[in-house]
């Protein structure tokens, strides 16, 4: 066996040594240019399948932008909203994601559609292709580009038939619209849920403070200690005024009557009775015991302040909810289709003149390089 291998190697060496550089240069054009060009032409004529492209242009805008008409003017002026640009890039990533591929495969039977590529082995998708290979094949069949000047997202889809290319693009638009709606509504729901949670907390605090106020009124058998204390103070002031007037009248009586005169005695008794009433009313207002009006008024004021504060807080949360609803509705994002996908009339791929020109250019460059290299080798031999 070893002897046979050595014989074969010796034969190959003999054949290679017999081939001169002149022979190689003589057939170099056939090897480098004609043979590859023939292979390309055979592939294009026999194996390649025509592929059709459908194209659409979309923009992501907020609902208030649409209402104000800023969509048309913004696009005409070449301006793009930073928020819309960010959303467009998010959408671009989603379109190229496995989630979008799964949705397309479910609706279009994507794997089955691209497995029927005829004899085109370069664009064939195996039914047993791995998930990674399937995703790579999908990305080769869709092109999503973002124009930062106009804020437009350009979506190009290809298929082996015009109908599939169109349906492919339409389904991408439908799933993109669902993604944008879900993303903006989810943000709005989160904001509204937070506002409603804060409102519920404020309502519970308000109910608790109201219950505390009612319990205080029931336990102390009083409606408003502050009002009662103010009424008692007003009454004491009135009685004090009456007492001062009666004392003045008594001094007037003493100018012409004796101390034991009936009018004087009666006036003194009236003043003493009035003073006793004043003392009694004052004892209701201020006293060291905790059930007096002054202490009750302080406690009541604290509880009442809690109720008023929690009431205002509850009103603020209600206002916040309404503002959140309005703001969420204003910031809802929509997918605006600027250019709808159309049914292609001509195949876009393969671009035969372009492929032939590029292939010929590459072959000629390679031919020139090898030709120069062989010439250098020939000079060194000489």
UniProtKB/Swiss-Prot annotation:
Per the record, the GO terms for biological process are: polysaccharide transport
Where do the TM regions start and end? 28-48, 357-377
> What's an example GO cellular component term for this entry?
Gram-negative-bacterium-type cell wall
Q: Which UniProt keywords apply?
A: Capsule biogenesis/degradation, Cell inner membrane, Cell membrane, Membrane, Polysaccharide transport, Sugar transport, Transmembrane, Transmembrane helix, Transport
State the compartments where it is located: Cell inner membrane
User: How does this protein lie in the membrane?
Assistant: Multi-pass membrane protein
Q: Member of which family? A: Belongs to the BexC/CtrB/KpsE family.
**PANTHER family given in the database record:** FERRIC ENTEROBACTIN TRANSPORT PROTEIN FEPE, TYROSINE-PROTEIN KINASE
State the name under which the record lists this protein: Capsule polysaccharide export inner-membrane protein KpsE
| Organism field | Escherichia coli
